[in-house]
Amino acid sequence: MYKKIEIFTDGSCLGNPGPGGCAAILRYKQHKKEFSIGYRLTTNNRMELMAAIIALESLKNPCQIILNTDSQYLLHGITQWIHIWKKHHWKTSEEKLVKNIDLWQRLDVAIQIHSIIHWNWLKSHTGHPDNERCDQLARLAAKCPINEDFY
C-alpha cells in the first residue's frame, strides 16, 4: 500500500528575472514537512518548477500524491505539454528547445517513481493555509538567496 501524500508548492521571484525562492509543504497523516530554498538570479516559472521538484525528490519511496499548485504554467506543462515535448525531442511547435528544459526533464524523472500523481490547481491568495504558508516561505527564501541559478 502506498502512502498518500498531499503536497503544496509555490514559487516567488523578486523581479523576473531576479532573486527567487521556492517552497513546498508535504503532509502525510498528521505529519508535516516544509522545504524552501532561494536562488540569486532566476525566474518565477523556474521557481514554480523547482518547488514541485524539491517536494517530489524528497520522497524516496513510491507514493500516491496530490500536488497542489497555483501555477498554471506548472499544471499545464506537466499534464498537457510535456507529452508533446517528449514526443518532439523537447522542442516546441516552432522547433525551439522548450524553456526551462533542464527543470522539465528533472521533474519528468521525479514523477516516474510514484504510483499516482493528481495535479490540482489552487487559486492563489484565497486563504488556504498551506498555500499561503508556501507563498510566505517562497518569498522569504527569495529575500535570502543562497544558490546560483540561471534563466
UniProtKB/Swiss-Prot annotation:
Pfam families the record matches? RNase_H
- Name the enzyme group at the top EC level: hydrolase
SS bond partners = none
Q: Where does Mg(2+) 2 bind?
A: 10, 135
Q: Where is the RNase H type-1 domain?
A: 1-143
Q: Where in the cell is it found?
A: Cytoplasm
What Gene Ontology terms describe where this protein resides (cellular component)?
cytoplasm
* Gene Ontology molecular functions: magnesium ion binding; nucleic acid binding; RNA-DNA hybrid ribonuclease activity
Cite the cofactor comment: Binds 1 Mg(2+) ion per subunit. May bind a second metal ion at a regulatory site, or after substrate binding.
- Regions annotated as coiled coil: none
Mention one GO biological process in which this protein takes part, according to its record. Answer: DNA replication, removal of RNA primer
UniProt record similarity statement: Belongs to the RNase H family.
Write out the function statement from the record. Endonuclease that specifically degrades the RNA of RNA-DNA hybrids.
Q: How does it assemble?
A: Monomer.
The name on file for this protein is Ribonuclease H
> What is the organism field in this record?
Blochmanniella pennsylvanica (strain BPEN)
